[in-house]
Amino acid sequence: FALSRPLQAGAFNYTLNRDSDEDWYLRSENTYRAEVPLYASMLTQTMDYDRILAGSRSHQTSVSGENNSVRLSIQGGHLGHDNNGGIARGATPESSGSYGFVRLEGDLLRTEVAGMSLTTGVYGAAGHSSVDVKDDDGSRAGTVRDDAGSLGGYLNLVHTSSGLWADIVAQGTRHSMKASSDNNDFRARGWGWLGSLETGLPFSITDNLMLEPQLQYTWQGLSLDDGQDNAGYVKFGHGSAQHVRAGFRLGSHNDMTFGEGTSSRAPLRDSAKHSVSELPVNWWVQPSVIRTFSSRGDMSMGTAAAGSNMTFSPSQNGTSLDLQAGLEARVRENITLGVQAGYAHSVSGSSAEGYNGQATLNMTF
């Protein structure tokens, strides 16, 4: 007789073998079962998403103009991690996938305090990510899908005379995840938290060109519910990571005043331009180095049998190079459209890499 498929228990697959003594034995395979890297990658996927969402909010849009504004943004992109030794060596499992979200953001208060411009507001977002995960040997482990809903708030301070600014963000996200392999469908829910402090100081190179050194610190945490699949229990420890981004923004600094409309159409005569070339436009590029450190997050698997528990702690530590570029145009007196695209490349460790594109509608009132 024979097993139709390997028997799974805890972190291992077992096969039925018959020895020379004619007795039958269950033996574990040399590698972990596919669900080990699959479930471990759930920690990384949620934290990658949370960081990308928080990073998609630009302080530039929140401080432009004197009026409160509402911004609607749509972003999509690719995210993943290279093979850096696999789960057996404590690295984040190799993965590749996509994400997308819609974010609505609005200013609540804009005022002047002690020579500083202060803006506060809130935002909400809904998104989805789907990532294919590979086993240590390069074979397919499965797919993790995540539906996420987020709420956040921000405080922006700008020193009126020097232009020095600071941007503080706090964000919470509810994650609903499903990890699917050939043998299991595992579901988990959890919460992600994030706090960010970003600062920059603009310098005018020419009348229309600006250089702005930037520095950002981000802390994030994650808590996923424990669960069980066909082979035993799955438990998650509290996850956390810290990130430092250092870079600069180089871009045009043109007057974005819309001026008088020039359209020949009567309904749009006072509010629209005759041609696209008349629209006020600014562009920017932003290269950065991002360092991830002090990452933590355990995933344990086992059964009721004593000694079966195995704990895995995939590291997200590493360094990546990031390049973002964007363009914004004022299409009405109170409406600005923006587009941006970016690419991140891991140069060491288990840092995330990928690319993204975003479109933003900004309306002042």
Specify the residue positions occupied by each region the protein language model found:
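Extracellular, surface-exposed repeat/solenoid domains
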Residues: F1-S28
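Compositionally biased, intrinsically disordered linkers/stalks adjacent to structured regions
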Residues: F12-D19, L164-I168, N254, T262, ...
